[in-house]
């Protein structure tokens, strides 16, 4: 009997170590990229990084793929009449492309359980099916940042709670923060925005802008029953090519 108990204890610890190791092998991160000079890059960019060291995988899932050759692209871009799609690239290529462009990249590692990480992977793989990967882009409500946020929330077993900011900005206020110094782009965007863009918006709506999403994620918590944990484990700058913070 004692031998059986010892064997069961050893089996339990062996399984525990296996599960713990499996969890440690997987890391999912929210990636936020600094703005570029093209109109579609003025606001920065958001993507998701999925790392599994046991499998040698390091992928970036990017909801910001599009064709710039689309007729009247800029007008359709702002009006929400452009089709975007989910693309997948290897992380070194993603990092290298932003380093060459001269844009810094921030990585926020998500505080997910192993089951949440696995669910997120399944959701991303489902999104990447040819029948699902293309979507109708909306400048404020359905873009690379909101898609990343929404799929993170779908994989979490509890609820993500964001801290409501004190400053109630409008869509136009935020747009102008990023179009400063790009007068013609700003004018073109302003001409496409309606009066709704001047109304104060809450924190969730402000997350259409990548760096507003970054700040919201930094303060967010995951609530499961009586348990509360931060959404972000830690943050670091993985591409550092700018003399000062762009935020």
Put a short name on every predicted segment:
Residues 1-23:
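Bacterial Sec-dependent N-terminal signal peptides
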Residues 245-247:
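Non-catalytic terminal regions of proteins
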Residues 22-243:
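Soluble extramembrane regions of membrane proteins in the secretory/endomembrane system
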């Amino acid at each position: 009997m004692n031998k059986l108990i010892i064997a069961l204890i050893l089996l339990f610890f062996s399984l525990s170590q296996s599960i713990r190791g499996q969890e440690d092998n997987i890391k999912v991160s929210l990636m936020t990229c600094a703005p570029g000079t093209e109109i579609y890059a003025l606001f920065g960019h958001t993507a998701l990084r999925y790392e599994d060291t046991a499998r040698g995988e390091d992928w970036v899932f990017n909801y910001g793929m599009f064709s710039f050759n689309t007729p009247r692209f800029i007008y359709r871009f702002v009006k929400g009449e452009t089709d975007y799609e989910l693309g997948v690239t290897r992380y070194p290529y993603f990092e290298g492309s932003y380093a060459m462009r001269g844009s810094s990249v921030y990585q926020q590692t998500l505080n997910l359980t192993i089951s949440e990480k696995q669910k997120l992977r399944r959701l991303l793989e489902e999104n990447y099916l040819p029948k699902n990967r293309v979507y109708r882009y909306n400048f404020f409500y359905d873009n690379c940042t909101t898609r990343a946020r929404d799929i993170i929330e779908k994989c979490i077993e509890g609820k993500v709670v964001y801290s409501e900011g004190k400053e109630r900005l409008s869509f136009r206020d935020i747009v102008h923060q990023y179009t400063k110094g790009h007068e013609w782009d700003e004018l073109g965007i302003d001409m496409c925005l309606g009066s709704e863009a001047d109304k104060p918006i809450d924190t969730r709506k402000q997350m259409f802008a990548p760096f507003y999403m970054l700040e919201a994620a930094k303060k967010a918590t995951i609530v499961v029953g009586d348990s509360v944990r931060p959404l972000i484990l830690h943050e670091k700058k993985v591409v550092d090519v700018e003399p000062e913070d762009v935020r």
